[in-house]
């Protein structure tokens, strides 16, 4: 049992010895229904978490200040803000200072990672973050499946731990619609 995705693909659940386990849905930069102008905005991140999604965020550290933003740091936050949401965040460190900061100050409770187009990246929580379109592995995170998923590769996604998408609402709705 799973979710039908463009062309009738089975998606978003996998069988286990204890029944169907839904895939975790991670909002990419706080997006809900496609890329938007409020990406990485703290209020948008909170909205995503309150809506039941995990959230991938982009973190910069400049002059000991924590900032969210994709191409550059825009929105100031602090370590308490991250810790208050640590169970729902996937933190993409955008510069070496952010990576060093989290590695030294967080006791590995906040899940974080670094990559720049790498095919595979291991997060601090030992999940394999897979570049869009690359081969998936059991327990990995499929990034932006809306860009590459087709009927030929649909079975691969069932092995994943999670998907990270700009369309979490769509995937959630499809999952709910296909549940018994």
Task: Locate the predicted segments by residue.
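Intrinsic disorder/low-complexity segments
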Residues: 6-8
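Phosphate-group recognition and catalysis centered on beta-loop-alpha active-site segments
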Residues: 11-12, 18-180
């Amino acid at each position: 049992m799973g979710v039908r995705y463009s062309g009738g693909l089975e998606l978003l659940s996998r069988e286990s010895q204890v029944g169907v386990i839904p895939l975790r849905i991670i909002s990419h930069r706080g997006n809900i229904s496609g890329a938007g102008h409020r990406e990485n905005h703290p209020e948008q991140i909170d909205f995503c978490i309150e809506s039941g999604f995990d959230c991938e965020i982009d973190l910069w550290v400049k002059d000991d200040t924590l900032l969210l933003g994709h191409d550059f740091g825009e929105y100031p936050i602090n370590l308490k803000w991250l810790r208050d949401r640590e169970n729902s965040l996937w933190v993409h460190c955008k510069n070496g200072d952010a990576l060093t900061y989290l590695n030294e100050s967080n006791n590995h409770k906040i899940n974080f990672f670094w990559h720049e187009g790498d095919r595979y990246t291991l997060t601090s929580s030992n999940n394999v973050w897979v570049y869009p379109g690359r081969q998936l592995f059991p327990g990995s995170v499929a990034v932006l499946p809306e860009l590459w998923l087709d009927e030929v590769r649909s079975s691969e996604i069932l092995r994943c731990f999670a998907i990270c998408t700009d369309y979490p609402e769509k995937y959630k709705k499809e999952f709910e619609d296909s549940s018994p």
